[in-house]
Each structure stands twice: as C-alpha cells, then as structure tokens.
Design a protein with these regions (language model features):
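Core segments of cupin and vicinal oxygen chelate
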Residues: 1-38, 61, 109-150, 178, ...
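Vicinal oxygen chelate
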Residues: 1-14, 37-113, 133, 137, ...
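Proline-rich intrinsically disordered, low-complexity coils
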Residues: 13, 31-33, 40, 46, ...
Length: 221
C-alpha cells in the first residue's frame, strides 16, 4: 500500500529562520524533498504524507478503515487525533541533499493512547508494530515500521482522549564526529555525543529551536 515516506509537515513560526537552520543542519542550501516547512492550508497540524501507487484505490481503502481523507490534486489528506496524515501519488522525490546528515532515520510521535495510535498506524495505514517496550527509566515506547520508515511513539501518561503529536526527527549520519565538528564550526549548539539506547548507535542532540522539532543525529555502527 504505502511505498515510502513522501514528506514530513512541520509548523515553523518563522519560515526564513527554519530554512536557514536546516541549511546549517545539512550543510547545503538545497531544500530537502521530504521536509515541508510551514503547514499548507489543508493541514491544521504537523504530520506525515506517504507515497502510494494508486491514490484513488488506497484512499478508498483507508476511508473504509476509518480515516476520512479529502482530495487535493495529487494528495488525499485528513486529520487523526492531532496529526495530519495523508497519501500522495506523484513522481518519486529527488534524492536528499548531498549532506552528511540529511537522511531521516526515524520520526518520533507522542501519544497518550496506546490502542488508538496502534489503530491509526497499523489498522488504517498498514504499519507493522515491531516493538512494545517499557524502558527501565519508565518510558513506554512503541516502534512501528512501514516501507523502510521507522516511527517511534512515546506513550505519555496523560488524558487518553488528548491529541497525538509529531514530536521529533532523528537524522542518520555515517560519521557523527565529523557531522558534529561541522555543525560546531557553524555555531550550532550540540550536546555531547553519547551512546544511544539502541545497541551500536551513538547520538547527539541538536539544540536549535528554529528547527521546529527536537532533533538528534544518530550514527549506526
């Protein structure tokens, strides 16, 4: 059904500042094809669009599964408990910009309702729930996968009728030491490099509010 991630929709208070921040992050001014900075008029919340091969057919199937979508040319989008979700049928996106940290490793969502977010991602969009884990420090995480995209959901101990939200992006780098050195030369504030929760990973937090969402770099050894 879903073939790949089309784009991530981010709500940015200042578009020019956000563009500059992502140019610093990637080390290039070339726009990232999977980032939509600023919400379109049909998106009331940040969220995700997914690429499909037969938009009318998949839209009907998703609608039957309980997610009502509205057509916008080559898109069909809707709202799901605080997230904008949608489908797109259009030519394959251009390659990510030629930077050292410009590939999306995974997305992070917040949700107060385990069953509801599973129904949204698995029941309506066809994701697989790969891992349901309670960390030793008390954080409950769900990990989903679909067409190469990993989505991590952090379950919040809030009112279960409250909204879900797009919370953060992890960007893959082949050499986190080199990426951090480049960013520090560009006056970007970073955390120290540390071991990630996943064995064999190292991560660093990028402390730049103009990126609009919490952002980390991750290296997989």
């Amino acid at each position: 059904m879903i073939t790949e991630l089309d784009s991530v929709l981010l709500d940015v208070p200042n578009l020019a500042e956000a563009k500059a921040a992502y140019s610093r992050l990637f080390g290039t001014s070339t726009p990232h094809p999977q980032l939509h900075l600023g919400l379109p008029e049909w998106a009331s919340h940040p969220g995700m669009l997914f690429r499909v091969e037969d938009l009318p057919s998949v839209t009907r199937m998703v609608d039957r599964r309980g997610l009502t979508l509205t057509s916008h040319a080559d898109l069909a989008t809707g709202q799901a408990h605080g997230l904008t979700l949608g489908l797109a049928e259009r030519p394959a996106p251009s390659a990510p910009p030629d930077g050292d940290s410009s590939r999306i490793d995974h997305l992070v969502l917040f949700s107060p309702n385990r069953d509801r977010i599973i129904a949204t991602l698995c029941g309506r969009l066809g994701f697989d729930l790969r891992l349901d884990r309670m960390q030793s420090w008390g954080v409950h995480q769900l990990f989903f996968r679909c067409a190469g995209l990993v989505v991590e959901v952090v379950l919040r101990d809030d009112d279960p009728s409250g909204p879900d939200s797009l919370w953060g992006i992890a960007w893959r780098t082949a050499d986190i030491d080199a990426s951090c050195a480049r960013l520090q030369k560009a006056d970007v504030t970073l955390s120290d490099i540390r071991n990630g929760h996943k064995p064999g990973t190292r991560v660093a937090t990028v402390k730049d509010r103009t990126l609009a969402v919490p952002t980390i770099l991750i290296e997989q050894r």
